From Swiss-Prot:
It comes from Mus musculus. Residues 628-681 form a coiled coil. This is tRNA endonuclease ANKZF1. ANK repeats lie at residues 515-545, 556-585. PROSITE patterns: ANK_REP_REGION (PS50297), ANK_REPEAT (PS50088), VLRF1 (PS52044), ZINC_FINGER_C2H2_1 (PS00028). The active site is at Q270. InterPro entries: Ankyrin_rpt, Ankyrin_rpt-contain_sf, ANKZ1/VMS1, VATC, VLRF1/Vms1, Znf_C2H2_type. Endonuclease that cleaves polypeptidyl-tRNAs downstream of the ribosome-associated quality control (RQC) pathway to release incompletely synthesized polypeptides for degradation. The RQC pathway disassembles aberrantly stalled translation complexes to recycle or degrade the constituent parts. ANKZF1 acts downstream disassembly of stalled ribosomes and specifically cleaves off the terminal 3'-CCA nucleotides universal to all tRNAs from polypeptidyl-tRNAs, releasing (1) ubiquitinated polypeptides from 60S ribosomal subunit for degradation and (2) cleaved tRNAs. Residues 143-154 have a biased composition (Low complexity). The gene is Ankzf1. The keyword DNA repair does not apply. Residues 135-185, 383-438, 460-497, 621-677 are annotated as: Disordered. One of its GO terms (biological process) is rescue of stalled ribosome.
Amino acid sequence: MAKPAGDAAVGSRSGELFLPSVSSSATSPAPSAAPAPASVSLLSLNGEAPLIRGLSLVSQAPGEALAWAPRTSCPGENTSSGGKVSPYSLEISEKLFCSACDQIFQNHQEQREHYKLDWHRFNLKQRLKNKPLLSASDFEQQSSTGDLSSISGSDDTDSSSEEDLLPLDEGRAESEKPNRPPGFYPHRVLFKNAQGQFLYAYRCVLGPHQIPPEKAELLLQNLQNGGPRYYVVLMAAAGHFAGAIFQGREVVAHKTFHRYTVRAKRGTAQGLQDAHGRASRSAGANLRRYNEAMLYKDVRNLLAGPIWSKALGEAETVLFRAPRSGRSLFFGGQGAPLQRDDPRLWDIPLTTRRPTFGELQRVLHKLTTLQVYDEDPREMVRFHSPETHWKPVREERKKDTEKEKTKVPSDANKPLGQDEEPLKQGSESQEEDGSEVELELVELTLGTLDLREFEVLPKRRRRRKKKERSQEQQCGAHGPLPQQPQDEPFSQPTQEVETPLDTLVYEAKAPGQPELWDTLLAACRAGEVEVLKLQLATGLVDPGVKSLLNAPLGSGGFTLLHAAAAAGRGLVVRLLLEAGADPTVQDSRARPPYTVAADKSTRNEFRRFMEKNLDAYDYNKARVPGPLTQEMEARQATRKKEQKAARRQREQQQRKQREQEEQEQEEQRRFAALSDREKRALAAERRLAAQLGAPSPPVPDSAVASAGRCWSCGVSLQGLIPFHYLDFSFCSTRCLRDHRSQAGRPSS
């Protein structure tokens, strides 16, 4: 006896609980899968093929009213109350539906193809930015102008191009969405032949652009003739170029180029980086700029050749794909191979990979393939829900099921424990009825992993040894870090992990005298010399203070001398050493206090103590390099003073030199700004004054008083052998030629 549709059932596989996701009758059959469309090459068709006899262009679905009848609401559709369901609703649609583009699909193949379209990807980006979505007609109109390179998946994309793809009329785009027929595909045209079959063909292989509305007779004629016979396919992205000329399936010519123009791990071309004001002067950037120029030259020379220029002129269809920043290869400039208003130019309506010859062949094969359906593809509906049906199970399998349940860990069954009791009661009531057949609910889930374009892998975590070293070096300037509890359930690592010095200091605790240890440690770290002197003075009568000076305490083995040196307290270090602290005591990592000192002044305290107490300790074990005497400190102070004076004198000389250079440049500029008449008058006055022995006449400005300068550029001729012609003097032959050409006397 079958269960009612709304009751739950207990599955007998692996001890798991299965509940029906939708209410359905036990005898209702699962919806049948839509048949896959047949594929026919457009290049293999001829005028007598039965497939293209009696063709007619299908503009709207015959059952459009039926298709728009009340049905289960999908995300993005209007509800009965008149409100619009949010596209982010959590309802599960029963149809193959795209809420971003408001499209219904007949099978998974069409859904996959739709997700790869630029139209769908652009609408997804628009919805994420809370911007209006494009209808198919508006998107088709803008894509014909060639502004879709940033959505094409190229390595060299620019986010600014997405902002350019705004709807032409946002109000009209929103109003056209409800009137759009279901199953509409941009870039494709639907035909129907005499046998009742439906054919989907790409619009770009059915002739050039037409002024809307398009003439159906021309589309039918191009399809019956097998489409254009000459194709030119051009692709460019990220330093790669690929082009090919096709005559039907035959390859007439093809060529590929590759230049290093995109920096690794950045993904943008060098020219695009320079255009954004981030011009780099590195050797790699200069190499990429050179390669961009050479790629531009190679592509232009190739397309300007006799074979390619003839093919571009005679081709009936030119298929094109390039990012926005790389379209200068084909458009603009002198002798551009392509024109933006060419009606034969079509942007490739497919997601493309790296431009190669194989990719060109794949694109042409995809675009020239017709999809043939026996039914109207816009009316075929397939429910996108888990297929469930009831399956009888014999009593002999009950024992096997119970064994499988015992194999499942108890932790895995805990979330289901609350639901087991009511379900067991229902199953016991059925067993009392004497039924020998148990119904098992089998759930078949359709996966969508095959729809992804790329496989996403988790990012590997890199080892961060350098950061740990920097934290160790800066430990003296930061406060203590919190200590990790000893009863933490995580296992200890097998390899040694470096611990900051602050943590080791903070872990040091005296088991017998915690208050005294805290007082001494705080005084050493804060540099409170008076408090430390008071505590050390009491150490003469209290042996506990003396015992704490050299006692390595805590798991890190730090002493008070370690703590003072790590904190950079030089006076405290000197006081501890004089009180009897041992500089040779090492911590758990075999480091004496000298090696953990924060700065040079703290280390010098150890060297001064060594100079006064040369035989007190083994300073090789303490790693103190040598004593620091007063004579050595005096020499170091004198050397630093001399270096400082020399640096100050050098800076003064450089400043004077800069001032002289600026003054010379100003005089040169003012002299070059004078006209030839003023220069000659100034020189004549100076010669006349020199002959008469009188002082030089006053000049307009002292900056141009000296006439011993180049007549053209104004450079001083002092120390140079000038070049003369007539009464003029020049610093070089170049200035002489320039002056002659300006005066109307070409040099011989």
